[in-house]
């Protein structure tokens, strides 16, 4: 077991009195086990020192804390720590240093695997899931880290963040390596990049899906959001950058890549610099087909996925697999066997009833893409059930209302994690993008889904957008159990979706 003095030697020179074995690192006091080191970071609203008492009670063997203004351990906490023999060690710039510290503790696991990081406004979850499905084989396993959890495609442990904290990232990578992973597909959010959660991860390939409007409540503006995303493509040692050249930001990153990183662009629009192109896209009820043209050859591709945006995701997956050395014929064969990702354009059907699609679309671009997809794949009227999250970017709400007015035939407005915000104000913001539309409002989300499913015809399609895989509805400070997927199954009157 590594000792604390050895662990921190590149950054701090500890005294013998502070030295002790390190059982693990934890940012969340609830994850502390006896002998773990509690890491107290400064946050945008709170400092981890607020949970110092909980960490000491759980058996923390030492505490690393990040200086921030006048924030410091309270006198009574210092006394309690001293009595327990627990050193409180101030580490300047700990937020930036935690990733490399954790990597050192857990044996630098990403150096022993090939890690693919996927970032972008929309498509991160789908691309990582599809890539892991394509790569994962019994003798050559591919791990997953992302919104749906961590593990392997057939066995995920639920998580709380798209990208976990820096200590958890390294601990998870070490676990996946022990379990046989030779490669890992990881979602990398803008928050994670801004907060240095993937510092210390040695990425082999970085993928950009697109850049649209999201998380402006955190980043302030689109420029700040873009700057955070771009950091993934400047990490030391990055070998490949897989970039969507149909996206303006993708082209910008392509032109700014540092030497030593090879660019592999992909395009559905025939961009001349794209090494992976999709041509002749056809959308059918059972999925999509196109011709894949690459620097490694050409081949027809079929995939059981819905939407032109999923065609772009297929290109991203193919390009990432090519960057890892997977042969084109193998890629084509495995794309045909992809399984839908829970809550990502996931179809539910029952004979004689409308088709229902559950999708996570919660940005204007994603909602437009999902609506365009169901319009292309189905012949009947397009129904839409959606709302917008509370205490988040208000500016996107009228844009989503505008998308609904343009692309849906029938719309039912409902709640989608209103949190502490007045749900009526959220609905009013959405309506600003669709003046004159008298859409029904059913605040109860299950009731709204049932309303649409009961009124839609058997040739129609109902898109339930916004929550996807989520299993709670956030109302006020409460997280109440709720699943769009389960509500759809109940509305269709069957036990499971197709």
Swiss-Prot record:
Motif range (Meso-diaminopimelate recognition motif): 416-419
Alphabetically ordered keywords of this record: ATP-binding, Cell cycle, Cell division, Cell shape, Cell wall biogenesis/degradation, Cytoplasm, Ligase, Magnesium, Nucleotide-binding, Peptidoglycan synthesis
Binding of meso-2,6-diaminopimelate, residues: 392, 416-419, 466, 470
Sequence positions that bind ATP: 120-126
Binding site for UDP-N-acetyl-alpha-D-muramoyl-L-alanyl-D-glutamate: 29, 162-163, 189, 195, 197
Domain of life: Bacteria
Main localization of the protein described in the UniProt heading: cytoplasm
Location within or outside the cell: Cytoplasm
Reported modifications of this chain: Carboxylation is probably crucial for Mg(2+) binding and, consequently, for the gamma-phosphate positioning of ATP.
SUPFAM superfamilies reported in the protein's UniProt record: MurD-like peptide ligases, catalytic domain (SSF53623), MurD-like peptide ligases, peptide-binding domain (SSF53244), MurE/MurF N-terminal domain (SSF63418)
Residues the record lists as N6-carboxylysine modifications: 229
EC class: ligase
One GO process term, biological-process aspect: regulation of cell shape
GO molecular function, one term: UDP-N-acetylmuramoylalanyl-D-glutamate-2,6-diaminopimelate ligase activity
E.C. number: 6.3.2.13
Cofactor names: Mg(2+)
Associated pathway: Cell wall biogenesis; peptidoglycan biosynthesis
GO CC term, one of those recorded: cytoplasm
Primary role: Catalyzes the addition of meso-diaminopimelic acid to the nucleotide precursor UDP-N-acetylmuramoyl-L-alanyl-D-glutamate (UMAG) in the biosynthesis of bacterial cell-wall peptidoglycan.
Family assignment from sequence similarity: Belongs to the MurCDEF family. MurE subfamily.
Protein name (database record): UDP-N-acetylmuramoyl-L-alanyl-D-glutamate--2,6-diaminopimelate ligase
Organism: Alkalilimnicola ehrlichii (strain ATCC BAA-1101 / DSM 17681 / MLHE-1)
């Amino acid at each position: 077991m590594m000792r604390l003095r050895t662990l921190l030697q590149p950054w701090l020179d500890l005294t013998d009195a502070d030295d002790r074995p390190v059982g693990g690192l934890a940012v969340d006091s609830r994850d502390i086990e006896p002998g773990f080191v509690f890491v107290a970071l400064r946050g945008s609203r709170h400092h981890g020192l607020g949970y110092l008492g909980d960490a000491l009670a759980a058996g923390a063997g030492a505490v690393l804390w990040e200086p921030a203004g006048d924030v410091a351990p309270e006198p009574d906490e210092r006394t309690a720590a001293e009595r327990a023999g627990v050193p409180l060690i101030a580490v300047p710039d700990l937020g930036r240093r935690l990733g490399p510290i954790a990597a050192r503790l857990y044996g630098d696991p990403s150096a022993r695997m090939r890690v693919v990081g996927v970032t972008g406004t929309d498509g991160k979850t789908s691309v990582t899931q599809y890539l892991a499905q394509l790569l994962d084989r019994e003798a050559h396993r591919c791990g997953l880290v992302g919104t749906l959890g961590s593990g392997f495609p057939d066995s995920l442990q639920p998580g709380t963040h798209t990208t976990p904290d820096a200590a958890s990232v390294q601990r998870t990578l070490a676990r996946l390596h022990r379990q046989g992973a030779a490669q890992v597909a990881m979602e990398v959010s803008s928050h994670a990049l801004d907060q240095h959660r993937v510092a210390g991860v040695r990425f082999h390939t970085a993928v950009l899906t697109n850049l649209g409007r999201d998380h402006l409540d955190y980043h302030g503006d689109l420029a700040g959001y873009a700057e955070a995303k771009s950091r993934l493509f400047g990490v030391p040692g990055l070998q490949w950058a897989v970039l969507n050249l149909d996206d303006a930001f993708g082209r910008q990153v392509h032109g700014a890549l540092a030497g030593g990183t090879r660019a592999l662009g992909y395009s559905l629009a025939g961009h001349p610099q794209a090494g992976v192109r999709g041509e002749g896209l056809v959308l059918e009820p059972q999925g999509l087909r196109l011709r894949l043209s690459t620097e490694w050859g050409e081949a027809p591709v079929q995939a059981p996925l819905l939407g032109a945006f999923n065609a772009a995701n297929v290109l991203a997956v193919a390009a990432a697999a090519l960057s890892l050395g997977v042969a084109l014929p193998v890629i084509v064969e495995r794309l045909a066997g992809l399984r839908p990702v829970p809550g990502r354009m996931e179809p539910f059907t029952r004979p004689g009833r409308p088709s229902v699609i559950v999708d996570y679309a919660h940005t204007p671009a994603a909602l437009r893409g999902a609506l365009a997809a169901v319009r292309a794949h189905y012949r009947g009227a397009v129904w839409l059930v959606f709302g917008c999250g509370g205490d988040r970017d208000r500016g996107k709400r009228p844009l989503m209302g505008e998308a609904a007015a343009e692309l849906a035939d029938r719309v039912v407005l409902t709640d989608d994690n209103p949190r502490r915000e007045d749900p009526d104000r959220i609905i009013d913001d959405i309506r600003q993008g669709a003046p004159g539309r008298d859409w029904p409002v059913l605040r109860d989300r299950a009731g709204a889904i049932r309303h649409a499913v009961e009124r839609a015809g058997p040739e129609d399609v109902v898109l339930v957008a916004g929550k996807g895989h989520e299993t709670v509805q956030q109302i006020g400070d409460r997280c109440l159990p709720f699943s769009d997927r389960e509500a759809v199954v109940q509305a269709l009157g069957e036990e499971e979706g197709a």
